[in-house]
Amino acid sequence: IGITNAIVLNLFYDYEGQKQDLIRYMRETEDELQILLCELAAYLHNKDMEINVWDRIIAFEGRMHEFIKAAYDYQDNTFHSHPGYYIDYFEMRLAQLQVLHNLHYEIKKIRKMPKQALVIADYIKYMADYVVEMNIPDQQIVKLEEISEQMKQEELPKTREEFEGRAL
């Protein structure tokens, strides 16, 4: 009888507040990722940074874990269709954030930023506008392929330092 009552009450309980929180977290995640991408682009342009972008990435990773927990709580407490969507979304964004975090270790190895870093920085800044919930990345892939082709046409590095900088 108790389980039946719990199931019936769960069917009528309004989880709209939790759902709205998740949607708000999604927008916050998109905004923060856009900011982080722009800061990373500025870092590659060797601009003076007021804040440490790497510390900000680490701090936001912690926040992402809170969002994932909220998504699991929503899934565990509802019978609504597609509650796993929010979990998948936040886990995808966390994976993207971890890629940015790992990029830090690679960028730190570069002694002198090659000119290609500016091209990459511009592409990263371009990509920031496309960090939205629904995006089909066809245009971004085409642009990346164009950049890749342009880089293949460039002159080969002359010094070891230049070679290592480009390789990273």
State each model region's role.
Residues I1-Q20:
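N-terminal alpha-helical membrane-insertion module
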